[in-house]
Amino acid sequence: MKIKILGCYAATPRTITNPTSQVLEIKSHMFLVDCGEGTQVQLRRHKIKFSQIEHIFISHLHGDHFFGLIGLISTFMLLGREKDLHVYGPKGIKEAILLLLKLGNAYTSYNLFFHELTSKESEVIYEDEKVKVTTIPLKHRVYTNGYLFEEKNKERKLNIDAILNYDIEKVYYNKIKYGGDITLDDGRIIPNAELSFDPEVAKSYAFCSDTIYNEEIIPIIKNVTVLYHESTFLESESHLAEKTMHTTAKQAANIAKLAEVKNLLLGHYSTRYGNIELFRTEANEIFENVLLADDGLEFEF
């Protein structure tokens, strides 16, 4: 599982920082999570192929989280994209994007599907045989969701030496991967435990964008591999966090501690601060495994 940070700063884009956008690589998927202004430039800068992006998840309709979406959709069209594109986000996102396309007399060359969200309860919004995506209801000034991405590691690892020893044909490999026992030609039943190893522990990533401190999310994100949690302010500006419905680094760390997550990834820093290491310092007072997002960084778990 890899997380590429395209942008992780709050509010306005600058020449040296970008608003929120990330690429999550998980189980052969490449998900784009939020799409602040300048996202497509960052995708090019970091050599991420546009064609690999088939699902885009938008947390809320504040500009620093979705103003890059119409530009990206338009560029896909100009490049002759044919692959379907799925966009998940708050109700209203479809109207906003289609209006801009209509005013420009533009139409996509590919199927564009909008999955608009309205529920204030956690819900599964995407699932296949490898990955499940669930919403994390957040509390901000507008309707906002975070997203929980979970691997499905059902396949067991083949014990090739044992399989070759029993001269088992390849046609049965898939059965072994999914826990099946094998009956040999002489009638012997070989238990799956002899032919395979336990699957890798499934990894998970919780993306929590703009939100006030909210312990209600803890059951949803419990024990995740990585929690990305916004940390717009330091404790010295906690009054601003409350006023604007954002979170401090310490508050994010407390959520991580209570949820018993493995790693905490901080981001969405206010540009008033010149040194983001201050966020780690404050968070470390409560939680040990703290990572700092920054534009262009990649994390692998």
Task: Place the predicted regions along the sequence by residue.
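Active-site neighborhood of divalent metal-dependent phosphoester bond hydrolases
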Residues: 81-85, 91-118
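Conserved beta-strand hairpin/beta-sheet module of binuclear metal-dependent hydrolase folds
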Residues: 1-46, 82-84, 147-149, 156, ...
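Active-site neighborhood of phospho(di)ester-bond hydrolases with catalytic His/Asp-centered motifs
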Residues: 33-36, 54-61, 89-90, 205-211, ...
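Metal-dependent phosphodiesterase/nuclease catalytic metal-binding core
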Residues: 118-266, 277-286
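Active-site metal-binding motif and surrounding structural segment of the metallo-beta-lactamase
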Residues: 38-88, 116-118
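General small-molecule cofactor/ligand-binding pocket signal
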Residues: 4, 88, 113-118, 134-136, ...
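Short acidic, glycine/proline-enriched helix-loop-strand junctions
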Residues: 85, 274-297
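Metal-dependent catalytic neighborhoods of phosphoester/phosphodiester hydrolases
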Residues: 69-75, 100, 274-282
